[in-house]
Amino acid sequence: MLATGGQPYYPFALLLTLYAAGCVPVARWAAGHARRIAVLVAALAVSVAVSILASLPMLPVRSVPAAITAVNSTDGDSIGWPAYVAQVARAYQALPAADRAVAVLVTGNYGEAGALARYDPGYGLPAVYSGHNELYRFGPPPDSARVAVVVSMRDIGTSGWFAECATVGRLDNGVGVDNEEQGDPICVCRNPRRPWHELWPSFQHYD
């Protein structure tokens, strides 16, 4: 699974078979022994509590400790999306009107692309494109797009794909949670050196 680029949690459903196999000997071990049953119940209670805190969004975002995001990065990665979209929107809205008319958004991953699509209403953002995983197959921006607001592509400024790129901001979730997007650049890139349909294969990446 990992060799093909899958996430490490994809095969976790197989753990159910191990739990099922373990239930019989545990039940035999605890049967008729009040102290063993008490130990088992206490262990289960601790396991459930830790699992809830590590897996579900139960804590206020400002209280999420680094230990939890280290165990389950998904917790940290679920924080800050509305703020990130607002910051990208400000970068787009700061463009001159002529640039906004020929602008697109390009993101480094599907999470950013999804957030921009989800929270776009009210901002009037242009179309979103990404070369990440299967989003690449939706195709490139039109060749008429001369300006790109590029999110979370750290090497875009040195790629040579555009005549100019400038970092105009950095993503900040506002609560100090160090997740995958925190601190990533928001860049404005102008004048692609080649048509988008020729550049697009360079944007493709799987992870």
Protein language model regions, located:
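Hydrophobic/aromatic-rich transmembrane helices and adjacent perimembrane loops
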Residues: 4-35, 39-40
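Short periplasmic/luminal acceptor-recognition loop of GT-C membrane glycosyltransferases, typified by
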Residues: 61-136
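Short phosphate-engaging motifs
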Residues: 9, 112, 157
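Membrane interfacial helix motifs at helix-loop boundaries and amphipathic/re-entrant anchors
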Residues: 2-14, 56-76
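Signature aromatic-anchored transmembrane alpha helix within multi-pass, membrane-resident enzymes
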Residues: 27-64
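Aromatic/acidic, Gly/Pro-rich catalytic loop(s) in extracytoplasmic/lumenal soluble domains
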Residues: 87-89, 96, 128-207
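Short, glycine/serine-rich, charged loops/turns that create anion-binding
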Residues: 46-49, 110, 155
